[in-house]
């Protein structure tokens, strides 16, 4: 897995001039990674449902996921030689490694702690939803994330969208409503938890993009920081909610099943960590638009596998609602991709005079922090090829100061 992920930035884009054999190998590598991604995601969701059906402690499952993230990312960051701090400008060609702190101190109370709390709350809410409702329905509700992103971006960041973007939300709304009214195993708390998790993920998306843009820290490094800080929110909740129940419960069924439960929890944590890393590898190898297609296909696979393996009852109308919502997510991604490409073309100079006339439009740079420059709100956001709807899938345009510059979690 790591070998595939460390193919290098050149492999990610499909190097021009590569022979037919190289293209075939690249296609085979993407196909294998996509199959692994689908299998880990679908298998992880099925395992989570199996665990929570017999072991109804969603906080424990969330804690295992956070701990797997904290344990797995540091060796991965060292293996991929991701710098601990953003690259800085200096004499000589190219960026230079930085040895300062990961983020400026002001970022921690303003962004890191709220984002870590959001990660904790979103993880717990997501597992509560899987506990209360079928996996297929929970993933259908998660398809509402573009709606939350558009609304919150308009309210918080004052970002306006095109008419096409707003119209692309209609199939998502219609599909989720149709799936909700026809869901045979509907539970109000399951719906509320799934919506709360999606809302938290959307807020994470907005503010994580801001941190990534303003600090230029590697997003895997930021994910590691958020995971480690989320543990401080997760452990007190686990002690108060789950551990206290373990200590006072008179039901010894949990004790007799501990070996099997612990094995499933370990498998769940590994699947969650591995699918994030493989998703990172896939976006290094394909275009963002192809990735959005692969991501929509993954959601279809998760829903299909969960319906087959868990055998929860569904109707044809219910399935139609699920597929409509997922199609809406793909249409939204395609519309956003086209809008970002158009904005990017508008920023590219046509001639030398255009370049000179636009030079004064560049945003000023904040005061250096330990030698690292942190750009403000100017044109840096348009250097991204595509910003999709989840922090896991946001791509940044960092300099090639380390092996993996085109990235995704």
Curated annotation (Swiss-Prot):
Transmembrane segments: 50-70, 111-131, 133-153, 165-184, 188-207, 222-242, 252-274, 282-303, 312-332
A Gene Ontology term for the protein's cellular component: Golgi apparatus
Entry superkingdom: Eukaryota
Listed Pfam families: TPT
Keyword Transport: yes
Main location: membrane
Bilayer topology: Multi-pass membrane protein
The entry's keywords: Membrane, Phosphoprotein, Transmembrane, Transmembrane helix, Transport
Entry-annotated residues carrying Phosphoserine: 363
Compartment(s) of residence: Membrane
Record-linked PANTHER family: SOLUTE CARRIER FAMILY 35 (PTHR11132)
Described function: Putative transporter.
Assigned protein family: Belongs to the TPT transporter family. SLC35E subfamily.
Protein name: Solute carrier family 35 member E1
Biological classification of the source: Eukaryota, Metazoa, Chordata, Craniata, Vertebrata
Name of the encoding gene: Slc35e1
């Amino acid at each position: 897995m790591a070998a595939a992920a460390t193919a290098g930035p050149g492999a990610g884009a499909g190097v021009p001039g590569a022979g037919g054999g190289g293209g075939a190998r690249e296609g085979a590598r993407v196909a294998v990674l996509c199959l692994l991604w689908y299998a880990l995601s679908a298998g992880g969701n099925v395992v989570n449902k199996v665990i929570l059906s017999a072991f109804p402690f969603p906080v424990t499952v969330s804690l295992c996921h956070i701990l797997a993230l904290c344990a797995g990312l540091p060796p991965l960051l060292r293996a991929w030689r991701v710098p601990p701090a953003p690259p800085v400008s200096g004499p000589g060609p190219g960026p230079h490694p930085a040895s300062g702190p990961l983020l400026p101190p002001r970022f921690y109370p303003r962004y890191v702690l709220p984002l870590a709390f959001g990660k904790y709350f979103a993880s717990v809410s997501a597992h509560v939803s899987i506990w209360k409702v079928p996996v297929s329905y929970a993933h259908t509700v998660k398809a509402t994330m573009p709606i939350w992103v558009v609304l919150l971006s308009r309210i918080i960041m004052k970002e306006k969208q095109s008419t096409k973007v707003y119209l692309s939300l209609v199939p998502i709304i219609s599909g989720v409503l149709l799936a909700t009214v026809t869901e045979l195993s509907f539970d109000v708390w399951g719906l509320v938890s799934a919506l709360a998790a999606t809302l938290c993920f959307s807020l994470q998306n907005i503010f994580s993009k801001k941190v990534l843009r303003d600090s230029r820290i590697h997003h895997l490094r930021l994910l590691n920081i958020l995971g480690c800080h989320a543990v401080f929110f997760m452990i007190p909740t686990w002690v108060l909610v789950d551990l206290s129940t373990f200590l006072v419960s008179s039901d010894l069924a949990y004790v007799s099943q501990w070996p099997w439960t612990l094995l499933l929890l370990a498998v769940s944590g590994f699947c969650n960590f591995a699918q994030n890393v493989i998703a990172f590898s896939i976006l290094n190898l394909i275009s963002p638009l192809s990735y959005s297609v692969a991501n929509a296909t993954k959601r279809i696979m998760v829903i299909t596998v969960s319906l087959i393996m868990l055998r929860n009852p569904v109707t044809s109308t219910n399935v139609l609602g699920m597929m409509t919502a997922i199609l809406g997510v793909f249409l939204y991604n395609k519309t956003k991709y086209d809008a970002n490409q158009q904005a990017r073309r508008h920023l590219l100079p046509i001639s030398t005079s255009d370049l000179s006339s636009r030079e004064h439009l560049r945003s000023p740079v904040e005061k250096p922090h330990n030698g690292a420059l942190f750009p403000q709100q100017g044109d840096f956001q348009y250097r991204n090829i595509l910003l999709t709807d989840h922090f896991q899938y946001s791509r940044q345009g960092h300099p090639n100061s380390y092996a993996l510059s085109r990235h995704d979690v």
